[in-house]
C-alpha cells in the first residue's frame, strides 16, 4: 500500500485534533521518610503553611515545616500504611471541621468525625480551625454572668460571658469536676457548651460523657475527644477544632461556654510534634512559639457586639451580642505555678481559680484557695444580689485564714478574735458543696444572707450543711413568691430583705438548730 505525503499529514492532523489533552495540574510530592506520625515529603513546591495534604488510603496530613527542598507534615490519624515513595498531593484547602447545632449531643474526634457509635452527623456547614480572633472594635465589655452553680466561684470568683477564667491545680484536685459542674448548671440558660478532652484516658472521657448524659447536659453540649491513645497531632489540634465549633454560636448572637481539659497536655503534644519536626527547643524543651499556641486559642473567646453579629449574619440576626466563654484547665506539678506553661496561661487569661491539694485532702471541696484566686473582669458581670451579699464572705475568709495561722500558737484569745475564728470556720463549711449539685441564684443568696447576718454563729459546724439544705427546702415550700422575685430581678429589695430575714428566723425557730 502506497501512501502519499499529503495523506500522511491529513492522518496526523486528524489524530492530533481528536487527542484529549486536558491535563489536571496537581502539585505532588514523594514521601522520603515517615516516623512517629511525621512525614518528610520531597517536592510540593507550591504548598502553603497549614495546608491539608492527601496521602494514599484517604489519609490527610498538615504541612507545618516548609523547607528548601522538602516539607515536614504531620499525619492526621493512622500512618502505618504510608511508606517511602508514596505520592502526596496538595489539596489547596485549610483544615476544616463540621459546625452547627447538628453536633449537639455528640462525641467527635479532632476532625469532627463521630466516635460515639450513633451514626453520621449531617452537618450543613464546615469552618476552618485556625481563625483570627475578633478585633478590638468588634468586642463588647463583659457584663452578663455565667452561673457555675458553685457557691465559692459565684460568690468570690465570678465569671462573665466572654471571659477566659483559668482553672489551675495539681492532679486530683477536682479541676474537671468544677468544669463539668459549670456545664451541668447551664441547663435551661440558653448557653451551648463544648467540652474538649485532650490527652486523657478514654475511660475518663467516657465517664464525663456519662455524667453529662445523666444530668441532661448533652442536649446542649458537644464533646471533642483526643484521647491519650490518639496521635500527638490530633491532641494538639483538638482545642482549635472545639473553639471553631463554639465560635459558630458566638458569631450568630448566641452564648457558648468551652472547656479545654487540659492545655498542659496540649502543650506536651505540641512539644512532641515540634521536636519531631526538628524545630529548635527553648525553655523546658518547648518550642519558641508555645505562648502563641495558647494566646491565639484563648483570644478567640470573647463577647462580640451586635454590629459584628449583624455583619457576620448579613443582617439575619439584629440587636444580639454573642459570646464564647473559655475555661482552660492547667495541671501543675507539685503546686508549681511558676513553671513555663502555667505562667503563660495565667498572663493570657482574665483570672484564675486555684485549687489546692491540702484543701482537697482536708475535705474542703471544691478546694478553691480564695486568697490567690481572682477574676479580673467577672465583678462587672456578677448578679446584683450575690455581689451585695458576697463582699462580707471574702473578708471573713481572708481574716480567718490569717488568724487561724496565729491561733495555732496562741493559747488565750480575746473574744473578738475567737468570734472571727468561729465565723470563719462556719463560712468555710458553708462553701463546701457536693459534686453535680449546682445551686440556683436564690439558693446562693439565701446561704450568703444567713452567713452575713450571723444566723450561722450559733449553729454547730457539723450542722452547717444540713441547716443550709433545710433552709432551702423551707423557702421552697413556704416562700415561693420571694424565691421567684429574687430569680426574676436578681436583686434583694428592702422588702425582700425583710421577708428573707423573717423566713430565716422562722426556720431557725421551727428547726432544731
UniProtKB/Swiss-Prot annotation:
Residues that hold ATP according to the record:
169-176
Cellular component aspect of the GO annotation: plasma membrane; proton-transporting ATP synthase complex
Q: Which GO terms describe its molecular function?
A: ADP binding; ATP binding; proton-transporting ATP synthase activity, rotational mechanism
Compartments where found:
Cell inner membrane
* Keyword field contains RNA-binding: no
Classification via CDD domains: ATP-synt_F1_alpha_C, ATP-synt_F1_alpha_N, F1-ATPase_alpha_CD
Q: Which family does it belong to?
A: Belongs to the ATPase alpha/beta chains family.
Q: How does it assemble?
A: F-type ATPases have 2 components, CF(1) - the catalytic core - and CF(0) - the membrane proton channel. CF(1) has five subunits: alpha(3), beta(3), gamma(1), delta(1), epsilon(1). CF(0) has three main subunits: a(1), b(2) and c(9-12). The alpha and beta chains form an alternating ring which encloses part of the gamma chain. CF(1) is attached to CF(0) by a central stalk formed by the gamma and epsilon chains, while a peripheral stalk is formed by the delta and b chains.
Q: What does this protein do?
A: Produces ATP from ADP in the presence of a proton gradient across the membrane. The alpha chain is a regulatory subunit.
Protein's recorded name: ATP synthase subunit alpha
Q: Which organism is it from?
A: Cupriavidus necator (strain ATCC 17699 / DSM 428 / KCTC 22496 / NCIMB 10442 / H16 / Stanier 337)
For this protein's source organism, the top of the classification is: Bacteria, Pseudomonadati, Pseudomonadota, Betaproteobacteria, Burkholderiales
Amino acid at each position: 500500500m502506497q501512501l502519499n505525503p499529503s495523506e500522511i499529514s491529513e492522518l496526523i492532523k486528524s489524530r492530533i485534533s481528536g487527542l484529549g489533552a486536558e491535563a489536571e495540574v496537581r502539585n505532588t510530592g514523594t514521601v522520603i521518610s515517615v516516623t512517629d506520625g511525621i512525614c518528610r515529603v520531597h517536592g510540593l513546591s507550591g504548598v502553603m503553611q497549614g495546608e491539608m495534604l492527601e496521602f494514599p488510603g484517604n489519609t490527610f496530613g498538615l504541612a507545618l515545616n516548609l523547607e528548601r527542598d522538602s516539607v515536614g507534615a504531620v499525619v492526621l490519624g493512622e500512618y502505618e500504611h504510608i511508606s517511602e515513595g508514596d505520592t502526596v498531593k496538595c489539596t489547596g484547602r485549610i483544615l476544616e471541621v463540621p459546625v452547627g447545632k447538628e453536633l449537639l449531643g455528640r462525641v467527635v474526634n479532632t476532625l469532627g468525625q463521630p466516635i460515639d457509635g450513633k451514626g453520621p452527623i449531617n452537618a450543613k456547614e464546615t469552618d476552618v480551625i485556625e481563625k483570627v480572633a475578633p478585633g478590638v472594635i468588634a468586642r463588647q465589655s463583659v457584663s452578663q454572668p455565667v452561673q457555675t452553680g458553685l457557691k465559692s466561684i459565684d460568690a468570690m470568683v465570678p465569671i462573665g460571658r466572654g471571659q477566659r477564667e483559668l482553672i489551675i491545680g495539681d492532679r486530683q484536685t477536682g479541676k474537671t469536676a468544677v468544669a463539668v459542674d459549670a456545664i451541668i448548671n447551664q441547663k435551661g440558660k440558653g448557653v451551648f457548651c463544648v467540652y474538649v478532652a485532650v490527652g486523657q484516658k478514654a475511660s475518663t472521657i467516657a465517664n464525663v460523657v456519662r455524667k453529662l448524659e445523666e444530668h441532661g447536659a448533652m442536649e446542649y453540649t458537644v464533646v471533642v475527644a483526643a484521647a491519650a491513645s490518639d496521635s500527638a497531632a490530633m491532641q494538639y489540634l483538638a482545642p482549635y477544632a472545639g473553639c471553631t465549633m463554639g465560635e459558630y454560636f458566638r458569631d450568630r448572637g448566641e452564648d457558648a461556654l468551652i472547656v479545654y481539659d487540659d492545655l498542659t497536655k496540649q502543650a506536651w503534644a505540641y512539644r512532641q510534634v515540634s521536636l519531631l519536626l526538628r524545630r529548635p527547643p527553648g525553655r523546658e524543651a518547648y518550642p519558641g512559639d508555645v505562648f502563641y499556641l495558647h494566646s491565639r486559642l484563648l483570644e478567640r473567646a470573647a463577647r462580640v457586639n451586635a454590629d459584628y453579629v449583624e455583619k457576620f449574619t448579613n443582617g439575619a440576626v439584629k440587636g444580639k451580642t454573642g459570646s464564647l466563654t473559655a475555661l482552660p484547665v492547667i495541671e501543675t506539678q507539685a503546686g508549681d505555678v511558676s513553671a513555663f506553661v502555667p505562667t503563660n496561661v495565667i498572663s493570657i487569661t482574665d483570672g484564675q481559680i486555684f485549687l489546692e491539694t491540702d484543701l482537697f485532702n482536708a475535705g474542703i471541696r471544691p478546694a478553691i484557695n480564695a486568697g490567690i484566686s481572682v477574676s479580673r473582669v467577672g465583678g462587672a458581670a456578677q448578679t446584683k444580689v450575690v455581689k451585695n451579699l458576697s463582699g462580707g464572705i471574702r473578708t471573713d475568709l481572708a481574716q480567718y485564714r490569717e488568724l487561724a495561722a496565729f491561733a495555732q500558737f496562741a493559747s488565750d484569745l480575746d473574744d473578738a478574735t475567737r468570734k472571727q475564728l468561729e465565723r470563719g470556720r462556719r463560712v468555710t463549711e458553708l462553701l463546701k458543696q457536693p459534686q453535680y449539685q449546682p445551686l440556683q441564684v436564690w439558693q446562693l443568696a439565701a446561704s450568703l444572707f444567713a452567713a452575713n447576718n450571723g444566723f450561722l454563729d450559733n449553729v454547730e459546724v457539723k450542722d452547717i450543711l444540713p441547716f443550709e439544705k433545710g433552709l432551702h427546702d423551707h423557702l421552697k415550700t413556704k416562700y415561693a413568691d420571694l424565691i421567684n422575685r429574687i430569680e426574676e430581678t436578681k436583686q434583694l429589695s428592702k422588702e425582700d430583705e425583710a421577708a428573707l430575714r423573717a423566713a430565716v428566723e422562722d426556720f431557725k425557730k421551727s428547726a432544731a438548730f
